[in-house]
């Protein structure tokens, strides 16, 4: 009769050995669902070696991947969120902000400053999705507005790398106001005929998509990034119809004329260098 269960005869006799695998050695790809070796993902710039899906990365990693080494000079680092509405849901808003600061090491969901790409100077802003979903609070809007004014003052191109769930609900109408505030600041930049490049990463949604993220002179995106206003599940439940294949992904938007270019992560830096170099070669107009 076949044995359905294995039973060791004694301690140490032909017993299968337990293999200890270090925690964090492997990671699951959100796109192809493959379990891949983390070191391979890191070597590829946080990109899945199986399907080329770009994993989400933080603001500091993004800076290291895009701008010239050591060239980023942060501005407005002292600005931080308050609690204008005394907001509380399951937690106090102030406690959520403290936890986000501890988790990311940042004061807010966006870093802004001066940088260089390929030796070309520019004003650079980059979102940290790990900070309350990269949500746009009043301080985020203020930092972006000041970055835009800095670009005008110094006659420099502007690059914003977005990764956000939209406006921060804990600040209510004050967060929604940042949509108009950033759009108005970008109108001044456009009036000065200074270039604005918008790079959309996964995810870029809500009030961020409905304002500055889609106002670039050139709008680039990483592959398979989720880009939209409401999420696909909400839309499908509202219209009660199935959504098209790839709906709200960067390739779908490119196909429908809402993006200029979808760029593999390993090519982002060189693509931006060429774009900014083109504008630099044109000599940006004086005021």
Describe these PLM feature segments:
Residues 1-17:
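N-terminal alpha-helical interaction blocks
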Residues 12-16, 27-28, 55-112:
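An N-cap/entry alpha-helix motif that binds or orients negatively charged groups
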Residues 29-32, 48-51:
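Short cysteine-rich clusters marking metal-coordination/redox-active sites
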Residues 35-36, 54-55:
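Cys/His-rich microdomains that often coordinate metals
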Residues 111-190, 197:
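Cleft-lining beta-strand/loop regions that shape enzyme active-site pockets
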Residues 162-280:
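Conserved catalytic cores of soluble enzyme domains
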């Amino acid at each position: 009769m076949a044995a359905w269960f294995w039973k060791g005869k004694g301690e140490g006799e032909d017993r299968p050995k337990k293999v200890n695998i270090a925690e964090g050695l492997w990671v699951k790809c959100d796109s192809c669902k493959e379990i891949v070796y983390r070191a391979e993902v890191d070597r590829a710039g946080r990109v899945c070696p199986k399907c080329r899906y770009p994993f989400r990365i933080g603001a500091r990693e993004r800076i290291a991947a895009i701008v010239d080494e050591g060239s980023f000079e942060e501005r407005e680092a002292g600005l931080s969120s308050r609690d204008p509405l005394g907001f509380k849901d399951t937690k106090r808003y102030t406690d959520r902000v403290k936890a986000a600061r501890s988790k990311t090491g940042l004061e807010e969901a966006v870093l802004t400053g001066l940088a260089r790409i390929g030796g070309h100077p520019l004003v650079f802003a980059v979102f940290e999705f790990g900070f309350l979903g990269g949500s746009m609070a009043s301080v985020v809007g203020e930092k972006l507005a000041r970055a835009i004014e800095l670009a005008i003052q110094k006659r420099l191109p502007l690059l914003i790398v977005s990764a956000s769930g939209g406006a921060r609900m804990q600040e209510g109408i004050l967060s929604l106001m940042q949509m108009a505030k950033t759009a108005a600041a970008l109108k001044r930049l456009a009036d000065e005929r200074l270039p604005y490049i918008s790079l959309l990463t996964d995810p870029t949604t809500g009030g961020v998509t409905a304002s500055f993220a889609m106002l670039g002179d050139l709008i680039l995106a990483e592959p398979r990034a989720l880009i939209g206003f409401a999420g696909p599940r909400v839309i499908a439940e509202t219209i009660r119809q199935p959504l098209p294949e790839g709906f709200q992904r960067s390739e779908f938007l490119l196909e429908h004329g809402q993006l200029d270019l979808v760029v593999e992560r390993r090519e982002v830096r060189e693509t931006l260098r060429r774009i900014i170099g083109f504008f630099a070669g044109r000599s940006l107009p004086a005021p």
